[in-house]
Amino acid sequence: MAKRVTGPEIEKLIQLLAKVPGLGPRSARRAALHLIKKKDQLLGPLSNAMGEAYDKVKICSRCGNVDTVDPCTVCTDTQRDQSIIIVVEDVSDLWALERAGAMNAAYHVLGGTLSPLDGIGPDDLNIRGLIDRIGEGGIRELIIAVNATVEGQTTAHYITDQLQGLNVKITRLAHGVPVGGELDYLDEGTLAAALRARTVI
């Protein structure tokens, strides 16, 4: 059994960092050591920022985004086309689409996907809030931007079924060949989706 070489406070820091997605025990040790070496430039400011985030971060009651205000900055942005809602699984998907900068629309975060095997049903997700938003009127298009997994497809079909009869156009993200992708390296499912989603040039 290895002997402890640091105090309990540093061990606790390492253990907590190791819980961050993408950081294992080794990476957490490196990150902790780096933070400690840069105590004034990184560790102190990071500690303060995390304390502020803990105190101020809220979940938007309208769309499910995380922000320090409710409703969130996206929902109150008058420069956005609020008649288009992009439905995403998680806040990280919202951020990814925003980085792409392809659309200036509103969002709705589901908080996951339907997964009966994991016990996740419609009531466990933010689907009712989406239906209520569309029921308020003023929404002309719903873009379902969930992952191309079985759970994502199931969720997309469920949402589409729930919105039958409402006057809203429902679209999905195209699936297929990524920009710069080579056909030889793509899996069969991706190639099949690309062929089905082909467009006229």
From Swiss-Prot:
<keyword id="KW-0233">DNA recombination</keyword>
<dbReference type="InterPro" id="IPR023627">
    <property type="entry name" value="Rcmb_RecR"/>
</dbReference>
<comment type="similarity">
    <text>Belongs to the RecR family.</text>
</comment>
<keyword id="KW-0227">DNA damage</keyword>
<keyword id="KW-0863">Zinc-finger</keyword>
<dbReference type="Pfam" id="PF13662">
    <property type="entry name" value="Toprim_4"/>
</dbReference>
<keyword id="KW-0479">Metal-binding</keyword>
<dbReference type="Pfam" id="PF02132">
    <property type="entry name" value="RecR_ZnF"/>
</dbReference>
<dbReference type="GO" id="GO:0006281">
    <property type="term" value="P:DNA repair"/>
</dbReference>
<feature type="zinc finger region" description="C4-type">
    <location>
        <begin position="60"/>
        <end position="75"/>
    </location>
</feature>
<protein>
    <recommendedName>
        <fullName>Recombination protein RecR</fullName>
    </recommendedName>
</protein>
<dbReference type="InterPro" id="IPR006171">
    <property type="entry name" value="TOPRIM_dom"/>
</dbReference>
<keyword id="KW-0234">DNA repair</keyword>
<feature type="domain" description="Toprim">
    <location>
        <begin position="83"/>
        <end position="178"/>
    </location>
</feature>
<dbReference type="GO" id="GO:0003677">
    <property type="term" value="F:DNA binding"/>
</dbReference>
<keyword id="KW-0862">Zinc</keyword>
<dbReference type="Pfam" id="PF21176">
    <property type="entry name" value="RecR_HhH"/>
</dbReference>
<dbReference type="InterPro" id="IPR000093">
    <property type="entry name" value="DNA_Rcmb_RecR"/>
</dbReference>
<dbReference type="InterPro" id="IPR034137">
    <property type="entry name" value="TOPRIM_RecR"/>
</dbReference>
<dbReference type="GO" id="GO:0008270">
    <property type="term" value="F:zinc ion binding"/>
</dbReference>
<comment type="function">
    <text>May play a role in DNA repair. It seems to be involved in an RecBC-independent recombinational process of DNA repair. It may act with RecF and RecO.</text>
</comment>
<dbReference type="GO" id="GO:0006310">
    <property type="term" value="P:DNA recombination"/>
</dbReference>
<dbReference type="Pfam" id="PF21175">
    <property type="entry name" value="RecR_C"/>
</dbReference>
<dbReference type="InterPro" id="IPR015967">
    <property type="entry name" value="Rcmb_RecR_Znf"/>
</dbReference>
